[in-house]
Amino acid sequence: MNKVQIWEEKVIIPTYEAGKPDKNPMFLEKRVYQGSSGRIYPHTVIEKISDEKVDKEYTALFLENDYLKVMMLPELGGRIQRAYDKTNGYDFIYYNHVIKPALVGLAGPWISGGIEFNWPQHHRPSTFDPVEYTYAENEDGSATVWMGEIENMFRTEGVLGVTLYPDKAYIELSAKLYNRTKMPQTFLWWANPAVAVNDDTISVFPEDVTAVYDHGKRDVISFPYAEGTYYKHKYDHVNIAQYKNIPVPTSYMAYRSDYNFIGEYDYGKQAGLLHVADHHIAPGKKQWTWGCGEFGKAWDLALTDEDGPYIELMTGCFTDNQPDFTWIQPQETKNFKQYFMPYKNIGYVKNATIDAAVNAEYDEAEGQLTVSAYTTSVQKGARILITLPGENGRQEKVLYEETSDLSPEKTYEVKIDREKLQQIPAYTEGEQNGTEVLCGLRVCV
């Protein structure tokens, strides 16, 4: 076991600098901004961004193990700026090589890319402000960066721990929110990872997500194949999980799901991102895009120089929609965990934990069932078991069983011909990537 490396380093990042704060406080009480208050005093408001790019020095915090390298910027809201998979050279979080703000945030400047942590309102009032930080090596060989603040709007306290473990290909987030006041307060928490997109990418929502909501649940449409008008655009059985099929700026949030994951996959690069968290604590599963049309392309140019389009896969804790706030009582602390991990070579995931992700697809034309798996650590002699549930409480039927060595560097795949699957009673008429998904199949790793 190799210990996780942790260090602080000065880095130079090309930057379009924000202007000076307005000296006058602003109390925009009736501002319509996803339920957030415009009364952000004592935060100052910045309303100008420079058109000139300069090299600027930032303090960066790094975590690195055998599989991942993570960079954080405490001077910019404590965001994760880069998350890099060393096994395949893939940035599983959108890596914006420049700091190029636009006036999107609650107090003005906001940047795309990385993972932003939105609280107590959206977008985070201090998203462009420095936060306090410290870091430590832990006894088990892991290492943690702690970043936090006492936010200015409600005087509540938020602390986030970012941890890497030895020999684990995932990032653990440990959040602690504390109401240090004598009054009940409201908050929301949405971790906001950006992912690079192109014509080969698809958002990976659990299979029980069959409808999605707009902000405030003011509109709803079927998912993934949209039928009807949404954001004033007409869809006729179009897969809106694919970036290339959404021409206009669009948000959607899962109506409900009993699964603990959400993600994205790039079929061109055969790699993607997964977020894993207890869906009872973190029910929020959202996608936002500027759209692939001309409006979206203009925003790409406004937010980056060369890194192209992205989408946001926001993950909400204690809420499934924006705006939807949660109460935190006087002296109450809320603790919760979220996990982000890369994966590769297995396509549109059907289920995932922090230990493994699995996919199963049946190709009617080829007459083959393909089962694949990815693990976040070395699993020697892992048992792969494919079963069908028995009828009327009977024992499960074992379709296939094998042992194999798996790791973040070595994924698993098996193809089972139709002749071996005669006992399968039925399959669903799914349309994900031209394949069909078996009904009732269980894959255990």
Map each language-model feature to its residues.
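A contiguous, surface-exposed recognition patch within enzymatic or periplasmic domains that forms
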Residues: N2-Q5, E9-M26, L61, M71, ...
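Extended, loop-rich substrate-binding clefts of extracytoplasmic carbohydrate-active enzymes
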Residues: M26-E64, S112-A169, D199, K297-T326, ...
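Asparagine-centered strand-capping/turn motif at beta-strand->loop junctions
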Residues: K176-M183, A373-T375
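Short proline/glycine- and polar residue-rich coil/turn motifs
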Residues: W327-E332, T403-K410
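Surface beta-strand/loop "capping" patches
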Residues: I346-Q379
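Beta-strand-rich binding/interaction modules
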Residues: G367-E402
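Short, aromatic- and glycine-rich surface loops/edge beta-strands on solvent-exposed regions
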Residues: I384-I386, Q422-V445
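Aromatic sugar-binding surface patches on proteins
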Residues: L406-Y427
